[in-house]
Each structure stands twice: as C-alpha cells, then as structure tokens.
UniProtKB/Swiss-Prot annotation:
Its main location: cytoplasm. The gene is fusA. It is found in: Cytoplasm. Residues 8-282 form the tr-type G domain. This is Elongation factor G. It comes from Desulfitobacterium hafniense (strain Y51). Residues 290-304 have a biased composition (Basic and acidic residues). Residues 285-304 are annotated as: Disordered.
C-alpha cells in the first residue's frame, strides 16, 4: 500500500489545556467537521468519542490521551487529546514528546489557569510550536483580549492574534480574519454555514490595529519582509501566511485564534490554521539518539528512506486485542508481521498487527510510514519510552522523564481470589502508566500503590474493580516522603565470609554526594588498573540502588545522589557479583549515615480563587498549613491567592475551604518540588515510623 499523504501534508498535533477549557469538545468538533464522526458527542452527556474510558464518561474529564486521525483539505492530521487534570500530567508529557505541534485551548473567561502554565512549561521543554485557541467565546464574561494579555503575562509567550472576535458572550457572531481582512459571520447554530462579509464598521479600527501588530510580527521573521514592511509596501496574503508559518515553527510567536467549539463556531478556521501554520514532520529538527553499543550520537531524518525508527509512547491494555503499544514513526517504513528491534531492552519483537486508532474504533493497516502515529499488537517486552528500530541500524532515541509519585495508599484484597488477581492487575496498570508504582511494605506486608494525586489513585482502584474484578479495601492516603543527603562523604564496604568451602569476598570504596533536585541517581566508575574487575562494577551500583530504597533516617527512598566507586579489592576465587552487591550496599549505608541525611517532602503549588471577603481567612489558613504565599491578583469579583504548601498539610483542604467560604472558594494544586522537612516535624515522622 503506497503512502496516502505525502510527509509534507502530515500534521501531528496535540490538544492541550487546563481542565474544562473545552479540549475534548474541540476535538469532537474537529472529528465531526473532518467527517470522522457522524453525530457530535457531548462531554456532559458522557458520549464524547475521545473520552472512551468509563471513568472518563462518568467524570466528564479526559484521563488517557486518545489518538485519532482525521483529514482536512488534503492533509492528514493525527490528533492526540490530552488530559488537563494535574494528576495525569504524565499523559501530557508523553504526548508532547511525540508531537510536532500543539493547539493550546484556553477558556475565554478563566484565561490562563494553573494547569495551563504546567502544560505550557512541558511544551517549552520539548520545543513544541503552538497555536492558541481561545474557546467558549459565547460564555458570560468572555474576554478574548484579556486572554491574549494573560498568555503574554503569565506564560511569558508572544501571542499574536490572527483573528479577532465579532462580539462576545451571547452576542458572539463570528470572527475577523486579519490575514484576508474579511469577516466570517455564522448564520446557523451548527456553525456549518457562514457568510464571508466586510468587516463591521464599528470594528474596522480595532481590526486595523491588530493587523498592524500581526504584520510587524510577520516582518520580524524575514529580512526581505522587514525591508518591504519598513518601506510601507503592502505584504501579499501569501507572504503573510508564510511569515506566520515561519514565526510559529521557529517559536518566535504564538498565533491566536478564537471560537466557541460547543456552538460550532471557529472550528474550521482553527483546522485551516493547523494545516497552514503547524509544522510537518519534515519541518522539525532531526530526531536525536545514540548508538546502543558505542553510545555515540546519531540521528534520523524524517523520511521513508532512512532506516526504521519509532518511539513507543503509551502502553494500553485493550479488552479485545490485549496489549496495545502506541508509537510514533520517525523514519522508515514498518509492515505488519515484520520484526523490529527494541534497542532499549536489546530484544527482537514481532509486530502482529498495526492499527490506526480513531478514539476507540480501530482500522487495521498493512504498514506505517515516517511521521505516522499508530498502535501495534504483539509487542510483549515494549514499555513506555522504548525505541523500536531496524536491527541493522540500531539507535536509542531520546526518551521521556517522568516525575516520581507524591502520594501513596495501602490496599488489601478482600478475598484470597482477589489477592491472586490483584498482583497481575497492578502489574498491567503499572505497565500502562510510568507514574504509577507499587511495592510491598517489608514491615507490614501490605501492598502500597503510589501515584500523582488522590484522583489518580482513585481511578486506579476504580479500574481494578471494573476491568479486573478485584475488590479491595483502601487505606488513607499517605505522603511519599523521600530522603537525601546534604554533604559528600567517602565510605568503605567490605563483605567477607569464610564458612567452609568457597568463601565470599567483595570490597569497595565509594564517594557519595548530593545532586540537584530531580537528577535521580548517578553511578560513576573511576576504578583504574583493574583493582576491581569490570564484571563486579555494575553489581556495586545495583547494591547501592537497592540500599537507597530504605533511607537511613526513616526508611524512605533516597533520591538525587551521585555514587562514585574509586577503589577496592577482590579475591581471585572468593569474589562474586553477589559479594560486591552486598559490599556496595554496605558502603552506601555507612556513607549515608555520615552524610548529614535529611527527610524531604513534596511541596504543592496551590492556587485558591475566593470572593474578596474571605481573603483574610484563606491566607491565614494557608499560613497555618506551613504555606508560603507567592502572590495575589484580582479577577472580576474574585481574588486569586497563589502559594506553595506541603502536601502533608493539604489533606482535607477541599472540605475546610468549602466551610470557610460557604462553598464559594475553589482551589487547584499540583506537585512543584521537594523541600526539606522542618526539624520538629522530621522528628515526628521518624518517631511515627519507628512506632509503626
């Protein structure tokens, strides 16, 4: 089967935003207009095509990023709808990694909300070009221009409107295209018919003012255009469009469009903007990677002629076909039934079938090409972030980094049967979601599950019951404390055992030092002259890593350290991998005790919106929770208080806030960073762990 759409006419985009800004509704409308869905699904009916998990339909939010493909004006658009709730940031992270561009949806009333900032930072990290779509222009309090200035102020971006609205709230009638300087006026409710007309007289000055700003931004992308603009010459429509495309892909500015997805207004012009201004796979830099054996830098071009390379960005358990691996093809061609090499795991895998996903319907296809996003059946060993490639030209592509869980609960199966099923079910769920982890508590024997927030764990438990028919009792949420060290130390680990027959001998000297937050664990080998043979180096690292799971002070995992092995000795007969693993573990424990250990806790970024009269009480309450107020701002009749509060102080906050503000206060929080626990609280934590 030949390629249907040339690579230049492929667009891989994500739809990202704050919860309730209207992402899923926008995606639904896109699918409706591009002819993929014959009846529009509404989120509040629980019938949206992209929200296909039962939990999503009940809660009216998007949890997993559904991938679908659509066609518009001779282009293929692969769309990933991402969740806006902070507990599911991992889904946003992995989608952005495999996309070339994104549509950021903002609510015209709320503007830039906290999760918008988080998602924006994630997109900045991956250098993803964006279009901003200011949605819900028909809502009470809709203000397009306030939205634009918030994008500039809060996100530090450079928004350039390429459209402005005609009216707002219930008077929202259409949009003015600043490229063609024509008005698009909607004449029916479905938004499928619109008339092109001249700009209404009362908006001519405003349209000219914003067109001037657009021309200035466009001229800035190209020297020739700048000369033409400065000499007062008119830029042609084609020059303006090329300039917008260049500025968008070069991350110089963010084109801003507007509409009301629910009322079907502005969706087709948004699709036009995606096709015209978002990058094709050929417009983005080559994908970088390393050779699995030599570690040398390598790259792949976005072309069918290059050797095959792809990144698995999501694993999903499907009730009909089993394990589905979603992947993005960066180069080459892949046929179903063929073998691929998983260079991350060093294993060959056979692709059973290749499926093109359309939310929750699927279509089997014989092959995929560079730039495509598809799902494969049959990959047994592949997990999120793995590279799939041609074994004759192996490469490991840059993967993704996921945050550690910040909250955990103990779960107990209700019956013996549940116990047997629970292990398998949890393993399946952990395979799908890299921010969900589980372990068995060594002291109590309980199964502990960890995640990014209460909602995240609630949904995991819900899926255990629904999909896997496992009934379990759930404990109270606990904070995921961690430990770290504050100074560098050197320490020795020596394991010698002589008890008849072959003995055991492992001996090493290591230096451990603190790293910057979020660095994880680094293991460095500085052994020279073979004082420890090469095959025993990795076991030392494994021993250290295992010892790090139980910290010195209160038994919490230790994070952000570098361990360097620099000396040691071995015995020709008695040394073994196990002996050196134990020596590594002993050295770490000895060193960590002297390295000024500290307990650290997750600190959340909290944003509370309350009517002005409750401000004093809310701020006082935040301070009593060891909070640090960062700033305040007024929006209409409400005030927004921003600050950082330790997660351990936030349990039950929703109820307290409701009672303090008579149900009128709302808040959002997301994990921000780890911070050292004050001495008096750390002592309490240690005592509690010792008593437990």
């Amino acid at each position: 089967m030949a390629r249907q759409f040339p690579l230049e006419k492929t667009r891989n985009i994500g739809i990202m935003a704050h919860i309730d800004a209207g992402k899923t509704t926008t995606t639904e409308r896109i699918l409706f207009y591009t002819g993929r869905v014959h009846k529009i699904g509404e989120v509040h009916d629980g019938a949206a095509t992209m929200d296909w998990m039962v939990q999503e339909q009940e809660r009216g939010i998007t949890i997993t990023s559904a991938a679908t493909t659509a066609q518009w004006k001779g282009h293929r658009i692969n769309i990933i709808d991402t969740p806006g709730h902070v507990d599911f940031t991992v889904e946003v992270e992995r989608s952005l990694r495999v996309l070339d561009g994104a549509v950021a949806v903002f609510c015209s009333v709320g503007g830039v909300e906290p999760q918008s900032e988080t998602v924006w930072r994630q997109a900045d990290k991956y250098g993803v070009p964006r279009i901003a779509y200011i949605n819900k222009m028909d809502r009470m309090g809709a203000d397009f221009f306030r939205g634009v200035s918030m994008i500039a102020d809060r996100l530090g971006a450079n928004p350039v409107p390429i459209q402005i609205p005609i009216g707002a709230e219930d008077q929202f009638k259409g949009i003015i295209d600043l490229v063609t300087m024509k008005a698009m006026v909607y004449t029916d409710d479905l938004g499928t018919t619109s008339d092109t007309a001249d700009i209404p007289g009362d908006l001519v000055d405003q349209a000219n003012e914003y067109r001037e700003k657009l021309l200035e931004a466009v001229a800035d992308t190209d020297e020739e255009l700048m000369m033409k603009y400065l000499e007062g010459e008119e830029l042609t429509e084609e020059e303006i469009r090329n300039g917008i495309r260049k500025g968008t892909i070069g991350l110089k500015f963010i084109p801003v469009v507007c509409g009301s997805s629910f009322k079907n207004k502005g969706v087709q012009p948004l699709l036009d903007a995606v096709v015209e201004y978002m990058p094709a796979p050929t417009d983005v830099p080559n994908i970088k990677g390393v050779h699995p054996e030599t570690g040398e830098a390598d790259e792949r071009h976005s072309s069918d002629k290059d050797p095959f390379s792809a990144l698995a960005f999501k694993i999903m358990a499907d009730p009909y076909v089993g394990k589905l691996a979603f992947f993005r093809v960066y180069s080459g061609v892949l046929s179903s039934g063929s073998y691929v090499y998983n260079s991350t795991k060093g294993k060959r895998e056979r692709i059973g079938r290749i499926l093109q996903m359309h939310a929750n319907h699927r279509e089997e296809i014989p092959e995929v090409y560079a730039g495509d996003i598809a799902a494969a059946v049959g990959l047994k060993d592949t997990t999120t972030g793995d590279t799939l490639c041609d074994d004759k030209a192996p490469i490991i592509l840059e993967s993704m980094q996921f945050p550690d869980p910040v909250i955990n609960v103990a779960i107990e199966p209700k019956t013996k049967q549940d116990q047997e099923k629970m292990g398998t079910a949890l393993a399946r769920l952990a395979e799908e979601d890299p921010t969900f982890k589980m372990h068995t508590d060594q002291d109590s024997g309980q199964t502990i599950i960890e995640g990014m927030g209460e909602l995240h764990l609630e949904i995991i438990v819900d899926r255990l019951q629904r999909e896997f028919k496992v009934e379990c009792n759930v404990g109270r949420p606990q904070v995921a404390y961690k430990e770290t060290i504050r100074r560098a130390v050197k320490a020795e680990g020596k394991f010698v055992r002589q008890s008849g027959g072959r003995g055991q001998y492992g001996h090493c000297w290591i230096e451990i030092e603190p790293l910057e937050q979020g660095s994880g664990f680094e293991f460095v080998n500085k052994i020279v002259g073979g004082v420890i043979p090469r095959e025993y180096i990795a076991p030392i690292g494994q021993g250290i890593e295992e010892a790090m799971q139980n910290g010195i002070q209160a038994g919490y995992p230790v994070m952000d350290i570098r361990a360097t092995v620099y000396d040691g000795s071995y015995h020709d007969v008695d040394s073994s991998e196990m002996a050196f693993k134990i020596a590594g573990s002993m050295a770490f424990k000895a060193g960590a005790a002297k390295a000024d250990p500290a307990i650290i806790e997750p600190v959340m970024k909290v944003e509370v919106t309350v009517p002005e009269e409750y401000m004093g009480e809310v701020i006082g309450d935040m301070n009593s929770r060891r909070g640090r107020i960062e700033g305040m701002e007024a929006t209409g009749t409400a005030q927004i208080v921003r600050g950082f509060v330790p997660l351990s102080e936030m349990f039950g906050y929703a109820t307290d806030l409701r009672s303090k503000t008579q149900g009128r206060g709302v808040y959002v929080m997301m994990f921000d960073h780890y911070e050292e626990v004050p001495k008096n609280i750390a002592e309490g934590i240690v005592a509690k762990r010792a008593g437990a």
